[in-house]
């Protein structure tokens, strides 16, 4: 099993301890040799050589530590750059997600449009038919009055004579006695609507006509007034009868 290599810090601490021990031995040896005036040749030289050797190793290790310090500073700068790049990558990833969502939506809408186009091509209608249909609508004046319309013009949007005869007033004049001359159903008037026989038959007949009905106690008078001749018609009839009687007497 391989022994793990010591770090630079541990090696420096070990060398410093050795230097400290050697320095103490040198100092103690020199102190003893002076006090006792005893000197053993070669002992101080060995300690000094060992001290110089340890100092050389310490200097070499300090160079290594200095280079490692520079490397550590470079690593810190690179770590900051990596963090910045990582933030840029995350931002770009977010933008790519948004672009993916937009593209997916656009692709879905494009597919739906293609389906609509295919469906329209399968059920295509010629432009001539559209023009004919538009001409029919404009010619019948179903949506607006003619440009040359004047009061008295029977054309639309006012109802024609046939539509008037088929409408509410025409039906009221042709109803049987028990259906019109009597009182209208109370529930119909209470609900504010006309009976089914008097319901409007055309779109131009407004439903407001049923809302303008009088109360039940006045319905008979309202119907009789609407069905009966007015004062001007009575005077015209009297004048015509007088003229006819005078002409017959003259002929006699």
From Swiss-Prot:
Keywords: Activator, Coiled coil, Nucleus, Transcription, Transcription regulation. Residues 213-252 are annotated as: Disordered. One of its GO terms (cellular component) is mediator complex. It is found in: Nucleus. The keyword Transcription regulation applies. Its main location: nucleus. GO terms for biological process: regulation of transcription by RNA polymerase II. Signal peptide: none annotated. Pfam families: Med4. InterPro entries: Mediator_Med4. GO terms for molecular function: transcription coregulator activity. Residues 5-31, 70-112 form a coiled coil. Residues 241-252 have a biased composition (Low complexity). Belongs to the Mediator complex subunit 4 family. Component of the Mediator complex. Component of the Mediator complex, a coactivator involved in the regulated transcription of nearly all RNA polymerase II-dependent genes. Mediator functions as a bridge to convey information from gene-specific regulatory proteins to the basal RNA polymerase II transcription machinery. Mediator is recruited to promoters by direct interactions with regulatory proteins and serves as a scaffold for the assembly of a functional preinitiation complex with RNA polymerase II and the general transcription factors. This is Mediator of RNA polymerase II transcription subunit 4. The gene is med4.
């Amino acid at each position: 099993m391989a022994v793990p290599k010591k770090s630079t810090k541990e090696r420096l601490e070990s060398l410093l301890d050795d230097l400290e021990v050697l320095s103490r031995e040198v100092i103690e040896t020199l102190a003893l040799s002076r006090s006792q005036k005893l000197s053993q040749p070669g002992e101080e030289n060995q300690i000094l050589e060992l001290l110089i050797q340890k100092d050389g190793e310490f200097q070499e290790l300090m160079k290594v530590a200095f280079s490692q310090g520079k490397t550590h500073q470079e690593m810190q700068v690179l770590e900051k750059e990596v963090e910045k790049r990582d933030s840029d990558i995350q931002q770009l990833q977010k933008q790519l997600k948004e672009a993916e969502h937009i593209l997916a939506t656009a692709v879905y809408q494009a597919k739906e449009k293609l389906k609509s186009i295919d469906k329209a091509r399968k059920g295509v209608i010629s432009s001539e038919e559209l023009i004919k249909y538009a001409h029919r609508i404009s010619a019948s004046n179903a949506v607006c009055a003619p440009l040359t319309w004047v009061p008295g013009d029977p054309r639309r949007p006012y109802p024609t004579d046939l539509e008037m005869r088929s409408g509410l007033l025409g039906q009221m004049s042709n109803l049987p006695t028990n259906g019109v001359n009597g009182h209208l159903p109370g529930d119909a008037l209470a609900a504010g609507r006309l009976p089914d026989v008097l319901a409007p038959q055309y779109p131009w007949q407004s439903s407001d006509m049923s809302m303008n009905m009088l109360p039940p106690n006045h319905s008979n008078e309202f119907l009789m007034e609407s069905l009966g001749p007015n004062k001007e018609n009575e005077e015209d009839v009297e004048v015509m009868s007088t003229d006819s009687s005078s002409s017959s007497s003259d002929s006699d």
